[in-house]
């Protein structure tokens, strides 16, 4: 079990089915020390209003020894790489994930998908790119991995993509992991949990990474401190409540 999950959705995204309290309970039960709540950005049809994200600090930082990161899974909106998380919003969040989602932007083809993703990565607003292996959005994998490493942005291996979402992602994800390794970048593990019982479930992703002998030191989730140092390298403030993690 990895002690950190960076991608989870609550009932604030109405196609997800668990509360923040239920996530804390599952995290404690599973031995997870740190998780991020990353509900969908406001351009998604059933996403929360932007006030949801600005009000996240009402949630206690620590509950029963488990820490929470205030986050968002933003939507990439166009070829310019713009996302539905403004710079003002980003400054109030601990972590910003971003990815392609059909209801907000359909595939533009490999060349323009790649341009959009590179623009998002280089914007300075995003720390993790979610499910980049989605076969609906072909990209130049090597080029994206190169730019992601340059800007210290992690590319996600999304467990949900191997189970019930984004069917056909596995081949692309293997190539992404290899490209990240060649480029000297980082992989982030995400359960993409839409129900609390899935928190920390990386089973299928880890099977794939084991097949290619992907090194642990290039996986972001191996410790809370590694994640927190990564976020501080992106200009995020130190969280005093997590000093012991």
Curated annotation (Swiss-Prot):
InterPro entries for this protein? Phosphatase_YcdX_put, PHP_dom, PHP_phosphatase, Pol/His_phosphatase_N, Pol/histidinol_Pase-like
Say yes or no: keyword Zinc present.
yes
EC class of the enzyme, as a word: hydrolase
Cofactor(s) needed, names only, are: Zn(2+)
**A Pfam family hit:** PHP
**EC assignment:** 3.1.3.-
Q: So where does Zn(2+) 1 get bound?
A: 7, 9, 73, 192
The record lists Zn(2+) 2 as bound by 15, 40, 194
**Single GO molecular-function term?**
zinc ion binding
Q: Share an example GO biological-process annotation for this protein.
A: bacterial-type flagellum-dependent swarming motility
Cofactor details (free text):
Binds 3 Zn(2+) ions per subunit.
Q: Which GO terms describe its cellular component?
A: cytosol
What CDD domains does the record tag this protein with? PHP_HisPPase_Ycdx_like
Highest taxon above the source species: Bacteria
**Record: residues binding Zn(2+) 3:** 73, 101, 131
Which key words are in the record?
A: Hydrolase, Metal-binding, Zinc
For this chain, the annotated S-S bridges are: none
Q: Which HAMAP family match?
A: YcdX_phosphat
In which family does this protein belong, per the annotation? Belongs to the PHP family.
Q: Describe the protein's quaternary organization and the partners it interacts with.
A: Homotrimer.
Protein name per UniProt:
Probable phosphatase PMI1003
């Amino acid at each position: 079990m990895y002690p950190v999950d960076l991608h989870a959705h609550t009932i604030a995204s109405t196609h997800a089915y668990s509360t923040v309290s239920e996530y804390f309970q599952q995290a404690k039960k599973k031995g997870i020390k740190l998780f991020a709540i990353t509900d969908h950005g406001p351009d998604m049809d059933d996403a929360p209003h932007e006030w949801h994200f600005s009000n996240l600090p009402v949630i206690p930082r620590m509950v029963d020894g488990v820490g929470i990161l205030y986050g968002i899974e933003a939507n990439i909106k166009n070829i310019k790489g713009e996302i539905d998380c403004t710079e003002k919003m980003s400054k109030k969040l601990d972590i910003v994930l971003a990815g392609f989602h059909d209801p907000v932007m359909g595939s533009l083809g490999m060349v323009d998908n790649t341009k959009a993703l590179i623009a998002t990565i280089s914007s300075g607003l995003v720390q993790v790119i979610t499910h980049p292996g989605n076969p609906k959005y072909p990209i130049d994998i090597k080029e994206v991995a190169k730019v992601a490493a340059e800007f210290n942005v992690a590319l996600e291996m999304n467990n949900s993509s191997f189970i019930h979402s984004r069917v056909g992602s596995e081949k692309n994800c293997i190539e992404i992991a290899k490209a990240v390794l060649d480029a000297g970048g980082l992989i982030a593990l995400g359960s993409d949990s839409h129900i609390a019982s899935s928190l920390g479930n990386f089973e299928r992703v880890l099977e794939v990474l084991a097949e290619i002998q992907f090194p642990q030191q290039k996986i972001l989730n191996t410790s809370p401190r590694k994640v927190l140092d990564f976020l501080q390298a992106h200009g995020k403030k130190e969280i005093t409540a997590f000093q012991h993690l």
